[in-house]
Amino acid sequence: MNYSQFLNMIPEATLMAVLLITFIADFCSSKSADRKWFNPLVCLLMVAHIAINIFPTEATSAFGGMYTSGPAAGVLKTVLALGTLIVLIQAKEWLSRKDTAFKEGEFYMLVLSTLLGMNMMVSANHFLLFFLGLEMASVPMACLVAFDKYRHNSAEAGAKFILTATFSSGVMSYGISLLYAACGTLYFDDVAKVITASPLTIAGMVFFFSGLGFKISLVPFHFWTADSYQGAPTTVTGYLSVVSKGAAAFTLCAILMKVFQPMVEYWTVLLYIVIVLSITIANLFAIRQSDLKRFMAFSSISQAGYIMLAVIGNSTLSITSLTYYVLIYVVANLSVFAIISSVEEHNGGTVQMDSYNGFYKTNPRLAFLMTLALFSLGGIPPFAGMFSKFFVFMAAVHGADIHTTLGAWAYGVVFIALVNTVISLYYYLLIVKAMFIKHSDSPLPTFQSACSTKLALAICTVGIVAFGICSFVFDWISVAANA
């Protein structure tokens, strides 16, 4: 084996180094001792990992072309690493509990293992490597969902996640087998050269799309989402809702545009249907929720629909707008989950929306930060979420212009998405109304979040404001996508 190939996998190599150092630090230190240094160590290692890989590099390959990584994939990996860093920072408050402190090392290693699997997914140029990366991400993620194993809800959520992940992997592997039967190869480049629209390849594409649809929580593959999000530890829910979803969405976009380009009219129709169903059904269900984590679950399903809008463009603008949307979604969504987690830790695990009535009077700063994040998720200017939605709409309209037979349909999908944006503003404002206007006889008491949570919220808030104002962020992504 030529080990020099690992030099072409710098993001994965540095991440494996972070994982190895974390394992050694956990193994060599006493779990009964006070390990306040452990979380800062892991976070500093992640900062170093991001700093090494933040600038796009030239296209590289390894393992006979099964692994390929270009500037666009490198930028997406940096975005995923940033989201992971924020999760690790805000997890410190939750991991300080007696029932989780002794598992702190396991949590970090599971999170880093899922990120490594996602990186392999993003850089895969072969269906086998893609599937291995997907399973590398899914198995540790199932452990994370069931991390609070002594809580009934967490164990139940883990079981549901495992069953759903197993089923979706089976569906996807069946689709891959059909594609192999039709094309005789599993390399993305070679499949793209020989694939034609036939009943066998269309079936393979649909099964493959369905398998990834489960990972992204697209309707009608979303049934596991609300229960798993509700039962998982809140920090894990935040990680699952942004980092995992972002990696799967980017990979689906890249494969559709690269491998299934000769069948563009077939998967475009499939996308239209899934986008409309995801945005509309998720919005209608979100309005009815009383549990804040279930509310955010349906919000994430709706956001997945908006992310998929970018794919309609079928161009480098699609990659650019999708990556930018994922970046903004990471900071906005993790900001909300950081506040929910902090409230849980200080107020007996409450996640009911009614509990936030009068939240502004007792915790004005957290209420203000929650409002900023919700406004960004809703696409209210001048926050970054407005620009991210604008760019995915622009990509979708670009797709409508280039499709000769399906252009009118694309405009219809964009119109439906715009209408649903107004609906989403309504249910995001329900939380704002509860915090600022509604009265409660027993409001949440005033409390101080941990320093780690404050740091995570500071990073997210700066991102929500600055990423929309500073054009160089979008330019950085655009240059990488067009390289």
Question: What function would you assign to each model-found segment?
Answer:
Residues M1-A483:
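Alpha-helical transmembrane segments of multi-pass membrane proteins predominantly involved
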